[in-house]
Amino acid sequence: PNANESWKYTVVFNCVYGWHYAQIPSLGIWRSVKLESQAPVEIEAPFVSTRSLQGDMRLAVTLKKINAPLKGKLQIRVVPKNFEGAPQFFEHEINSSKKTEQFSFDFKIDAPRLWWPNDMGEQSLYDMTVAFIPRNGARPDVEKTSFGIRTIDMAPFPGGEREDRYNWTFVINGKPMFVKGTGWCTMDALMDFSLEKYDRLLSIAKSQHIQMMRAWGGGLPETDDFYELCDKYGIMVIQEWPTAWNSHNTQPFDMLQETVVRNMKRIRNHPSLVMWGAGNESDKPFGPAIDMMGRLSLELDGSRPFHRGEAWGGSDHNYNCWWDDAHLNHNLNMTSPFWGEFGIASLPHIESVRRYLAEEKDRWPSRPGDHFRHHTPIFGTMGEFGKLSQYSGYFMPDTTLGEFITGSQLAQVVGVRHTLERARTLWPETTGALYYKMNDNYPGVSWSSVDYYGAIKPVHYFVQKSFAPLTGVLLFDRTNLSSQEVSLPLYLLDDCRRLNGKDYTVSVTVYNDRLDTVVCREFNGHSELETVKNLGNLDLNRAQTKSTMLFFVVDVCSEGKRLSRNYYFTNYEVRRGVIMSMPCTEITMKRDGRQITVTNVGKLPAIGVYVESPGYAHEFIASKNYLWLDPGESQIIEVNVDYPVCVKGWNIN
């Protein structure tokens, strides 16, 4: 309601103008300034594209006369960037009388190594040096870039092409894939775009099995560091231009066009970049500006698709949970051919909340007008505290700030992980799911899995399980199963065909509120190239579901080894706080450098076991967290800090 509308009349990082998150418009020069001398003939924006996976490549390069003719040699050197290999050299004679001319050259990489998305293979990269040597002996010009050998095609849904839908099946290097992803929010309202900050967030995304990020039209084209790290980590990028909600109709056309041209030339060599998008949530993505973006995506690139809008043409955004106050059951059941956005907002880590509450950090409950309510999605003007109370209240009482935060974060876990898992089971009718979102540009309540200060929320570790290449998943249509007959579909998901040709066992064990075993059932099979396998249903009667809590543990085993574990919790609405009041067990912790071994030495399962480093949540990363440990079981957790750590859990003494 109090947004600064001026962003609609220029081209800026628009989500910090008060329509969301922050009202801190950034102005001025925000990158380093440098002077460069001009060569007699300049090389402009070399563009490398893949013609075939056998290493057939094409270089398009523009030569511009400054004070010497376009006569000389164009020399090209290609060398592996992140693996061992011999350099290759190519040379072309140039003899042109024009002032500016674009040249295209085909070349072939010997023994090519491909660039693959995260979890699908290696991210092989090459460095290229392009030099123009003038015939008259004048100073040469040299440009450097990097690239990957990677093809992208878009295939239709199984029903075939439709006029009202884009082709939404991503085919990378000839392989159709279900895309696992999230949204990317330009990461700082005051434009702190340091390499270290990028690397923290993107390395966390890699460990979450993220394969795609949608860099939305609420932000801006990122710095080179962002795309280089996405290349390194195998994270594909949908890059939208900075328009939102039909702002392309009022933004200066020339300024938008310059933004597109400059940035498209700058980033188009990155193999991680797989799609151009016109902007965010415009319900009428038409007109001269949108047409210009589409035309330039062909003229300046042509190797990747362009979409005129998002959500559009078969993709969906859904926020009935949160803005429409829908029950969590809504997210458990909703489906889409391709999820572009969905999620539930939650509070950050308690250390982060106390940090931005400052002198109000010990004030609870929250009062209207205080810092707590200001740091909500629209500054407390749209009933956000009531929404937080609703979703947190499904899990926890609101007696303390800590309980309120925990409940909010658990609601986010449930509202995200079930939608992602259901989407995966629907492949190939559903071809991808991008939850909203990875990160924040301002401290406060939001949909992110990592808060503004860098602290990781629980949803990260649960998405890590939901997006694991190999996992078993149960589908739930409601959060409360108490005293009801239920039949829960069970699926085996194996994106990388790790089980191909092998026998497997998927076991499901159900525990009640005394942590007694209610049901233990095994589903046995032999894998033959399936990435999605329906194993049947887990049936429970009313007596078996009559409990204030139910826990479901799904293990995938083969050749005598457990290969993955997933677990679920239901019935928590029967009594607030019951999820944290299960019979207790005891955990021991042993540290060896940055390796933490946690062991359940009690007689009952340990639920939600996690390690943290008090006071350093903004720096801390664990390789995995929120574990289910059977009695006697040990797990090793890698951490990234040398600070003291402690182990906690939902039922630990």
Region locations from a protein language model:
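Active-site mouth of glycoside hydrolases
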Residues: 3-7, 13-17, 22-23, 157-316, ...
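Substrate-binding clefts and catalytic carboxylate motifs of secreted carbohydrate-active enzymes
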Residues: 25-28, 276, 326-502
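Secondary-structure transition/capping motifs at alpha-helix termini
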Residues: 135-138, 232-237, 266-270, 299-303, ...
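Flexible loop residues that form catalytic
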Residues: 38, 218, 281, 311, ...
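Secreted/periplasmic carbohydrate-active enzymes, especially glycoside hydrolases
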Residues: 1-213, 221, 425-426, 461-653
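Active-site region of glycoside hydrolase catalytic domains
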Residues: 21, 44, 141, 261-369, ...
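Feature marks short, surface-exposed loop/turn motifs that line or immediately flank catalytic pockets
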Residues: 151-153, 186, 245, 346, ...
